[in-house]
C-alpha cells in the first residue's frame, strides 16, 4: 500500500482524491484541509500532493509563507506542488525547506474538474517510479520542475490571449457590419484552430476572461517577462480585457 497525503481538498485536490478512490485501491489517502473537516495525520505518508491558495500580489509576486510552513512540517517524502507557482519556485522551496519539492501542474476547469482529471495526461517532474504506481494506466510526460512551471503559465496565459483575440475579432466584425457567428464558424472550418476559448461571450455569459486563474496568471507572467518579446506580446493583455469585460476584483 502507498500512503498518499493530499493537502488542500478544493477542486484540484478533490479531483485527485476522486480519481485515486475510483482507480487505485493500493493507495491509502490521508487528507489535510481543516476548513473542510479533513484532519488526517500525515506523519506516515510516502508522498504528498499540495494544492492550496497562494495569493498573487499586484506586482506579480506570490506569498509563499503558508506553503513553506506546510512543506516544512511534512515528513521527508517527495512533495508535489499543484498550485500555480512562478517559474523557479520549486527549486527555491526545495532549498529553503530541505524537502524534495517537485511540481505537477493541473489543467482543470472548475465546472468539469472531475471529468478533466480523468482524461488528462499527467506531468511528472520527479519520483517517477512511485508516481507510476499511483497513477496506474495514466499517460504521462516527464520534465523538470522549471519546465513544468513554465508549461502551466504558458498554457493559462495562452488561454487568456485566445479569449482576448476572439473578443477583439468579434468587435471588429461588428464594426465592419459582418456577422460574427458566420465568421467564427468559418475560422474553425480548417480544424487547425479548436473551438476552446473562441466563443464570445464565454461560458459565463460575459465578454473577456475571468475566473480565479487567468487574471492572476496573466498579471504575474506579464510582470515576469517584462523586457522580453514575450513580455511585449503580453503588455496590453490585461487592459484589453478590462476594455471588454470591465474591472473585476480578484483575490
Predicted regions and their residues:
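NAD(P)+-binding Rossmann beta1-loop-alpha1 motif at the extreme N-terminus of oxidoreductases
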Residues: 1-43
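Short glycine-/acidic-enriched loop or helix-start segments at secondary-structure transitions
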Residues: 16, 41, 59-60, 89-92, ...
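Short glycine/proline-enriched coil/turn segments at helix->beta-strand junctions
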Residues: 25-26, 38-46, 74-78, 95-100, ...
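Solvent-exposed alpha-helices and their adjacent loops that cap or buttress functional pockets
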Residues: 40-42, 114-117, 200-206
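Rossmann-fold dinucleotide-binding core
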Residues: 52, 78, 84-152, 221
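Interdomain hinge/lid region at the active-site interface
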Residues: 149, 164-251
Amino acid at each position: 500500500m502507498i500512503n498518499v497525503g493530499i493537502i488542500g481538498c478544493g477542486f484540484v485536490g478533490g479531483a485527485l482524491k476522486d480519481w485515486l478512490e475510483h482507480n487505485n485501491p493500493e493507495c491509502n489517502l490521508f487528507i489535510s484541509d481543516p476548513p473542510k473537516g479533513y484532519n488526517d495525520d500525515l506523519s506516515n505518508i510516502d508522498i504528498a500532493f499540495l494544492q492550496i491558495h497562494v495569493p498573487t500580489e499586484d506586482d506579480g509576486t506570490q506569498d509563499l509563507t503558508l506553503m513553506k510552513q506546510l512543506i516544512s512540517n511534512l515528513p521527508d517524502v517527495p512533495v508535489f506542488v499543484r498550485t500555480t507557482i512562478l517559474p523557479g519556485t520549486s527549486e527555491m522551496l526545495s532549498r529553503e525547506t530541505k524537502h524534495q519539492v517537485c511540481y505537477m501542474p493541473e489543467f482543470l476547469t472548475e465546472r468539469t474538474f472531475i471529468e478533466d482529471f480523468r482524461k488528462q495526461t499527467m506531468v511528472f517532474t520527479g519520483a517517477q517510479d512511485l508516481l507510476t504506481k499511483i497513477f496506474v494506466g495514466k499517460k504521462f510526460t516527464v520534465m523538470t520542475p522549471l519546465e513544468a512551471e513554465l508549461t502551466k503559465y504558458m498554457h493559462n496565459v495562452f488561454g487568456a490571449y485566445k479569449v482576448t483575440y476572439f473578443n477583439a475579432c468579434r468587435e471588429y466584425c461588428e464594426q465592419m457590419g459582418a456577422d460574427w457567428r458566420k465568421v467564427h464558424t468559418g475560422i474553425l472550418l480548417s480544424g487547425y484552430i479548436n473551438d476552446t476559448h473562441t466563443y464570445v461571450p464565454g461560458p459565463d455569459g460575459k465578454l473577456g476572461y475571468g475566473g480565479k486563474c487567468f487574471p492572476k496568471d496573466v498579471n504575474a507572467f506579464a510582470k515576469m517577462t517584462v523586457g522580453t518579446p514575450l513580455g511585449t506580446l503580453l503588455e496590453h493583455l490585461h487592459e484589453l480585457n478590462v476594455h471588454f469585460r470591465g474591472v473585476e476584483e480578484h483575490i
